[in-house]
Curated annotation (Swiss-Prot):
GO terms for cellular component: plasma membrane. It is a multi-pass membrane protein. GO terms for molecular function: metal ion binding; phospho-N-acetylmuramoyl-pentapeptide-transferase activity; UDP-N-acetylmuramoyl-L-alanyl-D-glutamyl-meso-2,6-diaminopimelyl-D-alanyl-D-alanine:undecaprenyl-phosphate transferase activity. Pathway: Cell wall biogenesis; peptidoglycan biosynthesis. Catalyzes the initial step of the lipid cycle reactions in the biosynthesis of the cell wall peptidoglycan: transfers peptidoglycan precursor phospho-MurNAc-pentapeptide from UDP-MurNAc-pentapeptide onto the lipid carrier undecaprenyl phosphate, yielding undecaprenyl-pyrophosphoryl-MurNAc-pentapeptide, known as lipid I. It comes from Rickettsia akari (strain Hartford). This is Phospho-N-acetylmuramoyl-pentapeptide-transferase. Its cofactor is Mg(2+). Keywords: Cell cycle, Cell division, Cell inner membrane, Cell membrane, Cell shape, Cell wall biogenesis/degradation, Magnesium, Membrane, Metal-binding, Peptidoglycan synthesis, Transferase, Transmembrane, Transmembrane helix. NCBIfam families: mraY. The lineage of its organism: Bacteria, Pseudomonadati, Pseudomonadota, Alphaproteobacteria, Rickettsiales. Belongs to the glycosyltransferase 4 family. MraY subfamily.
Length: 361
């Protein structure tokens, strides 16, 4: 909004001219989202506590230490959606179609998560909305997004860029739409599975969003994309502002979510954040890089899939003491804070590997 209002005055004012730069607006987005989070946090937490008598239901079969979390309110993802959404509307170019498509997906996945959190709180159990129902809703939203991208792009590309290999692109044809839906839905649920400990998912999400802030900027810049031999996609640079807002929102939320958490992001936050990262990876054509940068999410998801299939195949045997993987280490006696910090370190490594693919070809 500010960018669009100040655009006519860019050449007449030094201050207005600053808003012409994506980097300036991205830095400002981090500051604004952090500030909004600090302001909204105490108010939202107090409000959620007044509505949720028992807070988020805690699994009885989980680590014993988790029983101390009883009464902690959920739906804290509302804070993330509001702060990053407002900063994007304030600082991004609102004539950019990618901004609106991404915000649509972000909010839509947030609504699905809110429905799930609401069901858990009102029914006082950890099941919420049926898994199949959530998958169907996620699939429908992802399909709408993919169709919009196909329709709005004059020359839609169905190429899958393979990182670390020079000029290796796989033409998936119209199967790419199915693949893109899988990426978006998979990303949403992978982040959701990772969000099981205080602060565990928040920092890796921030690292992933920060990585895609850089990717969006490079892919949307003709000179940099040509130099790095990346597929140039006009107008994706504005997504840098949105990604920067996500980084600030996650850091602001971590202030209240660090152990012992005052609030959980819930599915409202995890589904929306995972979904928006998937959408941005599809728009920027860096779907495989998302799997690398967000490698922690992939590992957590794989641990659940392996556990379920092995349990069924062996009629009751388990690979891990408990899935997702972070609970396995808790069952081994690791303190929650140790699991969280070590997983953060792993996410940093994955982010660096993913970003190195931009140059190593």
């Amino acid at each position: 909004m500010l960018y669009n209002l100040l655009l006519p005055h860019i050449h007449n004012s030094h201050i207005a001219n600053l808003f012409h730069y994506i980097t300036f607006r991205s830095g400002l987005a981090i500051i604004i989202t952090l500030s909004l989070s600090f302001i909204m946090g105490p108010i939202l937490i107090k409000f959620l506590r007044s509505l949720q008598k028992n807070g988020q239901p805690i699994r009885s079969d989980g680590p014993e230490s988790h029983q101390t979390k009883a009464g902690t309110p959920t739906m804290g993802g509302i804070m993330i959606i509001l702060s990053s959404g407002l900063s994007t509307l304030l600082l991004a170019d609102l004539t950019n179609q990618y901004i609106w498509i991404t915000l649509f997906g972000f909010i839509s996945f947030g609504i699905i998560g809110f429905m799930d959190d609401y069901a858990k709180v009102t029914k006082n159990n950890h099941y919420g909305v049926r898994g199949k129902s959530k998958l169907v809703l996620q699939g429908i939203i992802s399909l709408i997004i993919c169709v919009l991208l196909e329709y709005l792009d004059k020359n839609p590309s169905h190429l899958l860029n393979v990182p670390f290999f020079k000029n290796l692109n796989l033409d998936l044809g119209y199967f790419y739409i199915v693949f893109a839906i899988f990426v978006i839905v998979g990303s949403s649920n992978a982040v959701n599975l990772t969000d099981g400990l205080d602060g565990l998912a928040t920092v890796p999400i921030a690292f992933t969003a920060g990585s895609f802030a850089l990717i969006s900027y490079l892919v949307g810049n003709l000179i940099y994309s040509h130099y790095l031999q990346l597929t140039y996609i006009p107008n994706t640079g504005e997504l840098t502002v949105l990604c920067a807002g996500l980084v600030g929102s996650c850091l602001g939320f971590l202030w209240f979510n660090a152990q012992p958490a005052e609030v959980f992001m819930g599915d409202t936050g995890s589904l929306s954040l995972g979904g928006v990262l998937g959408i941005i990876s599809v728009i920027t054509k860096h779907e495989i890089v998302l799997a690398i940068v967000g490698g922690l999410f992939v590992i957590e998801t794989a641990s659940v899939i392996l556990q379920v299939y092995y349990f069924k195949a062996t009629q009751g045997k388990r690979i891990f003491k408990m899935a997702p993987l972070h609970h396995h280490f808790e069952k081994h006696g690791w303190a929650e804070s140790k699991v969280v910090i070590r997983f953060w370190i792993i996410s940093v490594i994955f982010a660096l590997i993913g970003l190195s693919s931009l140059k190593l070809r």
